[in-house]
């Protein structure tokens, strides 16, 4: 019994004395913070670079249950100007937006814009959503972005939104 205890203590000592050196291999050329900043800058430039703006196919309702609308968006600086079939023919709505990095690169409409925020504000008995909204998002995760097409996913309801240049 005494020999078993000695061998057990010796084995534990050997396991405890192994090297704690951990060399992590870099899989990327740059740090995650620099890559996130570069992606935010790239997406911001893509939004502003479309000469005629973007056509946003905006869907509302859980699992697209309430259909969608088309929004025409032009991004410049920190402002977005929008027009829609919901507004008058010559009416545009302007508000602030931002592209930021949270858990992913996100497009957020920061100030109230009734063409987008209307669907995310409480509507009372008009909706089936427990939050009382029509199921619209105003914060979107940028899934993919190119000069011709940007794919978004609503942060709260998860509906896929497509923007085409």
Specify the residue positions occupied by each region the protein language model found.
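Beta-sheet ligand-binding and adhesion/scaffold domains
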Residues: 28, 110-165
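Acidic/polar, low-complexity intrinsically disordered N-terminal segments immediately downstream
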Residues: 21-106, 114, 145-147, 155-157, ...
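C-terminal motif of bacterial Sec signal peptides marking the signal peptidase cleavage site
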Residues: 15-19
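Bacterial N-terminal signal peptides that target proteins for export
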Residues: 1-8
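Repetitive helical segments and hydrophobic/amphipathic motifs
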Residues: 11-12
